């Protein structure tokens, strides 16, 4: 059976969550939607809130999964994180947080985790 893009995305996001939990992170939330964008996963690493973007590319004709996180996507990611934090009377300026990327190739076995992606 052929999966829709949404189903495929959900599957890769779930695999990313399991991977990060095996690395010691704790799951907080998934698919938090705002007008400016969506937060795929929100995890916690000790006292740090981790906003996770999950990307997947079957091939690199249009660039890698990592390359697909352009400046515009990064701004949406930051804006959505700030809105999520605002729900808890916090902001990017005063919260201990970071932005990680989990990038997949064609399969869930082809995984790359980049902590602090936005600091690169």
Swiss-Prot record:
It comes from the Bacteria. Gene3D superfamilies: 3.40.1350.10. HAMAP family: UPF0102. Transmembrane segments: none annotated. GO terms for molecular function: nucleic acid binding. Belongs to the UPF0102 family. This is UPF0102 protein HS_0739. It comes from Histophilus somni (strain 129Pt). InterPro entries: Restrct_endonuc-II-like, tRNA_endonuc-like_dom_sf, UPF0102_YraN-like.
């Amino acid at each position: 059976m052929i999966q829709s893009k949404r189903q495929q995305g959900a599957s890769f996001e779930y695999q990313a969550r399991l991977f990060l939990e095996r690395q010691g992170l704790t799951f907080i939330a998934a698919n938090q939607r705002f007008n400016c964008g969506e937060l795929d996963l929100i995890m916690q690493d000790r006292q740090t809130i981790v906003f996770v973007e999950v990307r997947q590319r079957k091939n690199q004709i249009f660039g890698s999964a990592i390359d697909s996180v352009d400046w515009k996507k990064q701004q949406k990611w930051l804006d959505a994180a700030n809105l999520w934090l605002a729900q808890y009377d916090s902001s990017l300026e005063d919260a201990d947080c970071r932005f990680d990327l989990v990038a997949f190739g064609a399969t869930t076995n082809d995984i790359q985790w980049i902590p602090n992606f936005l600091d690169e």
